[in-house]
From Swiss-Prot:
This is Large ribosomal subunit protein eL40. Transmembrane segments: none annotated. Belongs to the eukaryotic ribosomal protein eL40 family. Keywords: Ribonucleoprotein, Ribosomal protein. SMART domains: Ribosomal_L40e. One of its GO terms (molecular function) is structural constituent of ribosome. The lineage of its organism: Archaea, Methanobacteriati, Methanobacteriota, Methanomada group, Methanobacteria. NCBIfam families: PRK04136.1. GO terms for cellular component: ribonucleoprotein complex; ribosome.
Amino acid sequence: MARFEEAENRMFNVKICLKCNARNPAAATTCRKCGYTGLRFKAKEPRG
């Protein structure tokens, strides 16, 4: 996807809240905005 490993980590090494779609650190267990525990990693491959 990205040309550089550093750029790829910066773009995709985050978790997304399933409730409010906020970006969170990869080590997060709860959302920083709403406190929801349902987090997923950002998709590395395009859909479709």
